[in-house]
Swiss-Prot record:
Regulator of the cAMP signaling pathway specific to sexual development. Controls the levels of external cAMP by regulating the expression of phosphodiesterase pdsA and its inhibitor pdiA. It is a multi-pass membrane protein. Residues 356-372, 1123-1144 have a biased composition (Basic and acidic residues). It comes from the Eukaryota. Residues 1048-1062, 1083-1094 have a biased composition (Low complexity). The chain crosses the membrane at residues 47-67, 93-113, 140-160, 185-205, 231-251, 253-273, 285-305, 315-335, 706-726, 953-973, 1179-1199, 1325-1345, 1358-1378. PANTHER family: GAMETE ENRICHED GENE 10 PROTEIN-RELATED, TINY MACROCYSTS PROTEIN B-RELATED. The keyword Membrane applies. Its main location: membrane. This is Tiny macrocysts protein B. Keywords: Membrane, Transmembrane, Transmembrane helix. GO terms for cellular component: membrane.
């Protein structure tokens, strides 16, 4: 019982171990597949190797200048800023930036790992992954390991860099944000970081150990004998990143670690000499010596620990210039010393023809002589061709203890390098010396897998001895080598497998498939070509099988013919690409030859390819190795001009495009016509080509296709133009908003100037009266005078900007709006300091071109009041004079300039008789606002008119484009579609006329490939991108039902007989008299069904046979074929000599319902319905095109039109602000003792204020200001009302209540007695709050302005999105509808031509009447 348990436990343990070992082998196989796909022929080019070395130098140097080291002085500060600006890029952005960067890196790494897993899985299954996936994998591993290893590891370590605190364990990098280390949001980051560090490190170390070029013959890349030193460098990088990320708070530990590892790397780079290129080794050693110097000075800096002294910095910088040459020359001297050890090695001068025994004897004598000499270091014994298993060469240097096995490879490298430098007189002698050195080294280091790997590499790449190389490889395999050596063996095995497939690749070093990925792509392409080839033959067989039915479905025939043409085209393209990659592949040449013969019917080109394949095969069979000379192949049959041309240009065998130009095909075929044809036949052939050209629609389809491309491009360009126009309107609309505010502010300044002049007069009148001192009045007058002068400049600039058409009047506003815009981020300049000249305006606005604006600025339409004060008279009167808007504004500004300069005495005594002063004060409250209100209205109307005109132009243009589209459909599409459809039916009807024996023979022909691949099942191992796989089941009923023999066994037997009777096709068709004996149909002039005629009559053939096969050589004479057929009929041997399959099919006529003589039923309805859908296709596509564009334009029209009305709303808000100033003007007049006070004008201004205020929309953006939640709206917050103010509650209730109070109090003041006016609380309310109200109303206006600008930007975004989507939709409509439609037309035409290639000559020249086509 116990023994049973023990046995079972042993069995379980053994099975577990075997499972583990099997899994490890599977894992190794997958990883080796990934590495091989990634590495083969695609290691770093020279320039990338140099760049990666420079990046590595910078990364390693930066570890000496981290933040924890006390580099002193400004020099130390800048060194740390330059060499190590940040610990990691994520530190710059905080924890949020680190998180974003972390997940981006994680996503890219996961994609890379998935890529690795996919490639490994495919290789494990024996497949090859997609080519682009392999290329992506190469760049991912190369870039992430060689360049980004330190940044990625450092980034992953940031989430693990924790420290303890009172709040728990937090991330040390972001201690100010208090991020918990293994809790909350950082927990998944920490877990994923640990996993990715392990996985990424495995990937990095594995690729570093294997990702290198070992072939010294490759000149485009730097080769290496091994990559173990690179693994050491990568480990040092990992340690540096780990220590500087997690323990950087212990600078002594990081600095010592830095120094120790740099000592190892520096001496390692000198001793190991990792690259075969010695100059690169020297440069690398120089870089490592520089970093070693930096690490040493880092220790010195830590010891001094003085952050004020820059001495160590300067010493470090100076020492760099000495450290590099020290490392450089140390490497060079070491290599020379090691090379000098082999300088005395001598080899026997053996001629190539020398007998091996004689050479051994001579070698023995020389070795004895050399051993007797005092300078001899090497003893040569007898040296047969072996692997060094016996100690026959004595080299005392290898007995020394410090000598390591890799010294042998370095010394052999020096021997070969000396040969390259011209030291050795013979290349073969150097190779033999190196070989002997390797064998000597293997005797002293027999267990060194590294040395055996170097020796195998030498045999394969340098000595070119594959036999001994593979023997050495097997020896190495039995040694249980390390991982990198096992991968080297795997590489050589794969290369051997690739070489063994020579019948597919052809001779080595020819073609373009030396790269592994290119080779696998070549194989994948080859199996795809075979698949298409076989499918094409199957479809041809199905096509003829369907014709055995009594009722022939033309739709099924059309479908099969389409598949024949499609697979033929794919196979042809695949074969041409294969020959372009490798023109000497025997298997491809044979398969392509068969394809040209059986499908394309191009026998001459097929013969050329077959002959070339036989010649190459003969050379390859005679050769004992895989080394070929391409000149041997190119010399095949060089005496024949046509074959020579074929061999020199393998891709010159071009199939004629099935839709090629008929004129070119006709000219080529005409030159190859047989001389036996009569002149009448030649002229008849030209006539047939001319008639065929009438229905040949290739050129028409191409032109129509380009026309549709042009039409779609025009529509897209139209939408782009519309978008540009609408964006231009948006800019114009935005500038118009600016202009509306500017116009109102111009009127505001005019009203304010009038009020200030009245105030100046009032202060002059009350000077010295009561508490009003003269000094105080003068100060107030001076302040008001400065405001008037500034207002004049502002008004002048705005007035000129509007008239001259300033394109961007954003700065042309009053002081309140200017501050509001500046606070909101607008670029504002001061317009109140200097008057701008004409040249300083950009004058790009076109709104002034409106008729209404032109009339307003050029026609007298404004009545201005002018004061009449005759000299010497105390009476004054007012006179009305008509101005235009431009002259009125200029007159007002000029008068204000003069009025602002009046003296104190003039203000006090004689200003009422000053016409300039009174011109301003009288016209300011009514006339000037009225002028600018008209200008504003005309300005807005001009904008709306411009928008409406643009929309109308776009609409009319689109209607014209749609009309053109409709004409294209009616005039071009319909005739071409109808013509192609009818010719399709006409061609299919012809096949129903084929003799039955021909149909039976072609439907039972056995499909057999010439080139049989022993690994034919391997094509199932390759992924396919074919989209015709789903069509393989189409017509399976044809194979089952339409087979003329009852069972498949009979089929196969009969097919064998058919191969011997390819030329015997029974036919009763007689071209001379137009009879078809087997079908019982005789052509006659009165027949409406079928008409045949002689070549001398005007018949309408579907295609000239020589036109279809334009690339073929001279065809057999048609008269000879007809004569042969007549002889067969005459001798009566057609049926007797027919195949068994033909006799069997004829005996089973009843099974198919057609006896071969009676007329068959043709089902044309389904095909006609399908072809009829073509008309609906282009109609639907056209209306979709029209619909999408119309919908996009309609939406954009709606958005633009709605926004165009927003100018009126903004104008009302501006008018409300203007009316408040007019009201304030009249209130000021009430206490300035003015004799021109008009109560009615004041009431009108109040009414307009209320009207504007009540009609403005209640926007969400304005609601806080109106309801009081906005707070203090003063521009200067120091002027806000304190809570202790008696007006605080009223103002705090919102601008809506304040405006209402303004209107009510202004009405009260208008009807208050003059004597009680000064004591009125309403007047005190005005004096306290009016400036505050102005700012509030201006803020409301700016809010409306900003709202409409945002709405305009949103509309612009919507317009851009809609029109962009419309452009994409148009492109999609073209790609999804128009392009497939044109391709469908072209395919229908191509299929028609492909059908003609299948048509026997017996029916090809027949004419089918229109009645047969039209009948159902």
């Amino acid at each position: 019982m116990s023994s049973t348990k023990s046995g079972s436990s042993k069995y379980s343990s053994g099975s577990s171990i075997s499972l583990i070992m099997g899994f490890s082998r599977s894992l190794e196989k997958g990883s080796f597949g990934v590495l091989y796909a990634m590495i083969k022929g695609n290691t770093f080019p020279r320039i990338l190797t140099i760049l990666s070395m420079l990046i590595e130098f910078c990364q390693l140097s930066s570890f000496g200048f981290k933040h924890q080291y006390p580099w002193g002085g400004d020099a130390g500060y800048y060194l740390k800023r330059i060499m190590s600006p940040v610990s990691h890029p994520s530190d710059v952005f905080g924890y949020l930036g680190f998180t974003i960067l972390f997940w981006i890196a994680v996503g890219l790494l996961i994609l890379g790992f998935l890529n690795i897993w996919y490639v490994a899985y495919q290789f494990y299954r024996g497949k090859i992954a997609n080519i682009w996936i392999i290329r992506t994998l190469r760049w991912f591993v190369s870039f992430s390991v060689a360049v980004l290893f330190i940044p990625i590891i450092s980034l992953l370590l940031i989430g693990l860099d924790c420290e303890g605190s009172s709040e728990g364990t937090i991330l040390r990098k972001f201690d100010n944000e208090t991020i918990q280390c293994f809790r909350g949001a950082n927990l998944p980051i920490a877990v994923i970081s640990i996993i990715l560090i392990v996985v990424f490190s495995i990937v990095a170390f594995t690729s570093s150990a294997t990702y290198y070029e070992y072939d010294t013959n490759v000149k485009s890349r730097f080769s290496k004998p091994h990559a173990r030193f690179d693994v050491t460098v990568l480990f040092a990088k990992f340690v540096f990143a780990f220590f500087n990320s997690l323990v950087d708070f212990v600078p002594w530990l990081t600095s010592i670690t830095f120094f120790v590892f740099m000592v190892i790397l520096t001496f390692g780079s000198i001793i190991v000499l990792p690259y075969n290129n010695q100059r690169l080794n020297q440069v690398r050693s120089g870089f490592y010596t520089v970093v070693l110097w930096v690490s040493f000075m880092t220790l010195v800096t830590m010891g001094i620990n003085d952050e004020t002294s820059p001495a160590t910095c300067y010493i470090t910088i100076v020492g760099v210039f000495f450290a590099f040459p020290i490392g450089f020359f140390s490497n060079m001297f070491y290599f020379k010393w090691l090379s000098s050890k082999v300088s005395d090695i001598q080899i026997l001068n053996q001629s190539p023809s020398m007998d091996l025994k004689d050479a051994n004897k001579k070698g023995k004598r020389n070795s004895v002589e050399k051993e007797s000499s005092p300078t001899s270091k090497v003893t040569w014994g007898k040296q047969p061709i072996t692997l060094g298993s016996k100690r026959q060469i004595i080299f005392p240097f290898f007995k020394k203890k410090f000598v390591m096995s890799f010294f042998v490879e370095i010394m052999a490298r020096s021997i070969l390098n000396n040969n390259n430098e011209g030291v050795s007189s013979s290349s073969n002698e150097s190779i033999e010396r190196a070989n002997n050195l390797y064998q000597c080294g293997l005797q002293y280091f027999p267990n060194s897998d590294l040395l055996w790997m170097a020796y195998c590499n030498f045999l394969f790449t340098v000595r070119k001895d594959r036999h001994i190389g593979y023997a050495a490889l097997e020896k190495l395999r039995r040694m249980k080598p390390s991982f990198d050596v096992r991968f080297f063996i795997y590489q050589r095995d794969k290369e051997r497998e690739q070489i063994m497939d020579s019948d597919l690749r052809g001779p080595e070093h020819t073609g373009k498939i030396q790269d592994f990925v290119s080779y696998m792509e070549f194989k994948k392409l080859y199996y795809g070509a075979k698949r298409h080839h076989v499918k094409c033959l199957n479809y041809i067989k199905r096509f003829w099988g369907h014709l055995l039915h009594e009722t022939v479905d033309l739709h099924r025939l059309s479908d099969l013919s389409g598949r024949i043409a499609t697979t033929e085209n794919k196979a042809n393209e695949s074969y041409e690409r294969l020959l372009a990659l490798n023109p000497n592949s025997v298997r491809v040449l044979r398969d392509y030859s068969q394809f040209l013969e059986e499908v394309v019917k191009d026998k001459e080109s097929s013969y050329k390819l077959q002959k070339k394949a036989e010649a190459i095969e003969d050379i390859m069979s005679k050769s004992q190795t895989t080394d070929f000379k391409i000149s041997d192949i190119k010399a095949i049959d060089s005496d024949e001009d046509d074959i020579e041309k074929t061999l020199q240009e393998p891709t010159a065998i071009q199939l004629a495009k099935i839709d090629a130009d008929i004129e070119k095909s006709g000219s080529k075929s005409g030159s190859s016509k047989s001389k036996d044809d009569s002149s009448e036949s030649s002229s008849s052939s030209k006539g047939r080509r001319g008639k065929y050209k009438e229905f040949q629609q290739s050129n028409a389809i191409n032109k129509l296709s380009w026309l549709m491309i042009g039409t779609t491009c025009c529509c897209i360009i139209f939408l782009i133009v519309v978008l540009v126009v609408f964006r231009g309107l948006e800019v114009k609309h935005t500038n118009a908003y600016q202009g509306i505010i500017s116009i109102t502010d111009c009127a505001n300044e005019a009203v304010q100037m009038g009020m200030h002049l009245n105030a100046m007069q009032a202060y002059a009148l009350v000077a010295g009266v009561g508490n009003n001192t003269v000094e105080a009045s003068l100060i107030e007058i001076a302040r008001r005078r400065a405001l008037v002068k500034r207002g004049i400049i502002i008004m002048k600039n705005i007035h000129d900007a509007i008239y001259w058409g300033e394109g961007n009047p954003v700065s042309y506003v009053g002081d309140n709006l200017s501050q509001l815009k500046a606070r909101d981020g607008y670029d504002i300049f001061d317009i109140g300091s200097v008057i701008f000249t004409f040249d300083q305006f950009n004058r790009s606005s076109t709104l002034l071109d409106n008729k209404q604006m032109i009339e307003l600025y050029s026609q007298p339409s404004v009545n201005m009041s002018v004061l009449v004060a005759p000299p010497g008279s105390n009476t004054t009167s007012l006179y009305t004079q008509t101005y235009n808007a431009w002259k009125a504004g200029n007159a007002f500004i000029e008068s204000a300039m003069l009025a602002s300069d009046v003296t104190f005495d003039e203000l006090r005594y004689s200003v009422n008789q000053n016409p300039n002063f009174k011109f301003v004060t009288i016209n300011a409250p009514v006339i000037m606002p009225d002028i600018y209100n008209k200008v504003q209205t005309a300005y807005i109307d001009s904008l709306v008119s411009d928008i409406t005109g643009t929309l109308d132009a776009i609409l009319y243009t689109w209607c014209g484009i749609f009309a053109v589209l409709f004409l294209i459909c009616a005039v071009l599409f319909r005739p071409i579609v109808r013509k192609i459809s009818r010719e399709k039916i006409r061609t299919l009807v012809l096949f129903s006329l084929a003799p039955k024996d021909v149909v039976v023979k072609l439907s039972t022909k056995k499909i057999k490939m010439v080139s049989l691949d022993s690994g034919s099942e391997r094509d199932n191992l390759f992924d396919t991108t074919d989209d015709d796989g789903r069509d393989d089941h189409l017509g399976e009923d044809d194979n089952n039902i339409q087979t003329p023999v009852g069972d498949n066994n009979n089929n196969n037997n009969n097919n064998n007989n058919n191969n011997n009777n390819n030329g015997s096709i029974s036919s009763n068709v007689t071209k001379s008299d137009g009879e078809i004996g087997s079908d019982g149909v005789r052509s006659s002039s009165g027949s409406n069904v079928l008409n045949t005629s002689s070549p001398y009559r005007d018949r309408r053939p579907l295609m000239d046979s020589t036109s279809v096969l334009a690339s073929t050589a001279t065809l057999n004479n048609r008269n000879v074929r007809l004569q042969a057929k007549d002889e067969e009929i005459t001798n009566g041997g057609g049926e007797r000599k027919g195949s068994d399959a033909t006799r069997t099919a004829l005996s089973e006529d009843k099974k198919y319902g057609w006896d071969g003589k009676s007329k068959r039923n043709l089902n044309k309805k389904s095909l006609k319905s399908i072809l009829g859908r073509l008309h609906w296709s282009y109609i639907l596509a056209t209306f979709l095109l029209f619909g999408f564009i119309t919908m996009g334009i309609w939406v954009t029209f709606t958005v633009v039109f709605n926004n165009s009305q927003s100018g009126y709303t903004l104008g009302k808000s501006c008018s409300r602000s203007l009316n408040s100033r007019v009201i304030n003007y009249y209130v000021a007049e009430l206490y300035t003792y003015s004799q021109y006070v008009s109560t009615q004008n004041m009431v009108d201004a109040i009414t307009e204020l209320q009207s504007s205020h009540q009609s403005l929309p209640y926007l969400e953006e304005v609601r806080p200001l109106m309801e009081g939640s906005y707070g203090c709206w003063a521009l200067n917050k120091s002027t806000c009302l304190p809570p202790s103010s008696m007006y605080y509650e009223e103002v705090n209730s919102g601008l809506d209540r304040v405006v209402d109070s303004l209107a009510k109090k202004a009405i009260n003041l208008a009807y208050t007695d003059q004597a009680a006016l000064l004591d009125s609380p309403d007047l005190q309310w005005f004096l306290a709050l009016i400036d505050y109200i102005f700012i509030g109303l201006d803020t409301a206006t700016f809010t409306y302005f900003d709202y409409f600008l945002e709405k305009q930007e949103w509309a612009n975004t919507v317009l851009t999105a809609i029109l962009s989507v419309s452009c994409v939709i148009l492109l999609v409509v073209h790609v999804v509808l128009f392009r497939p439609f044109m391709n469908h037309l072209r395919i229908q035409h191509i299929h028609t031509l492909a059908l003609l290639r299948l048509a026997p000559d017996d029916i090809r020249y027949m004419e089918v009447s229109d009645k047969v086509i039209d009948e159902d």
